[in-house]
Amino acid sequence: NALFQGEVTPVSDVHAGTREVQRFRLSGHGHSMVITDLPGVGESRDRDAEYEALYRDILPELDLVLWLIKADDRALSVDEYFWRHILQCGHQQVLFVVTQADKTEPCHEWDMAGIQPSPAQEQNIREKTEAVFRLFRPV
C-alpha cells in the first residue's frame, strides 16, 4: 500500500492481509511492470507450509523478489528458512529491503517534520542493515 500511496490491499493490525497472490500493473512512459504480492510468512506453521508450496510455484515466474524485513523485527528465523530453502534455490534476483525505519528504537526520536531518523536511530538502522546483509548472504 505504501508503494501505491493508498489502500490497494486490505491491511489489519491483527490479521494477515494477503492470503493469495495479487498482481498489480504499473504503467508509465511507454513501459509497464507487474508487481506480484505474495502472503507474508511467519503467521503460523500451517500457513507457512501452504505458502511454501505457493512460493515454489510462483517464484520461477518472477524476475526480481523484494523480501521485506521490518526494521524493528529481530525474529528472522522464518525469513532465514525461506531464504535458505526456497529463495536461494531459484534463479531470480532477491533484494532484501529493511522497512518501517521510523519504528527503529528509540522510536520516539523519529523526526516527524523532517521525516528522518535521529542519530541513534540512524546507527541502529545501519546495524540492522548490516545484520540483514550478513544473515542473508548467499552461501
Where are these regions (language model features)?
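Short, flexible loop segments at the rims of nucleotide/cofactor-binding pockets, characterized by
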Residues: D13, V41-R47, A71-A75
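Flexible glycine-/small-residue-rich
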Residues: D37-G40, V98
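Conserved C-terminal guanine-recognition region of P-loop GTPase G domains, centered on the G4
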Residues: S27-G30, A53-P138
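Short acidic, gly/pro-rich beta-turn/loop elements at beta-sheet edges
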Residues: V34, D46, P106
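Flexible beta-alpha connector loops of hexameric P-loop NTPases
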Residues: P39-D48, P117-E122
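Well-ordered mid-protein domain cores that form the structural environment of catalytic cofactors
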Residues: R19-V21, I35-T36, A49-Y55, L64
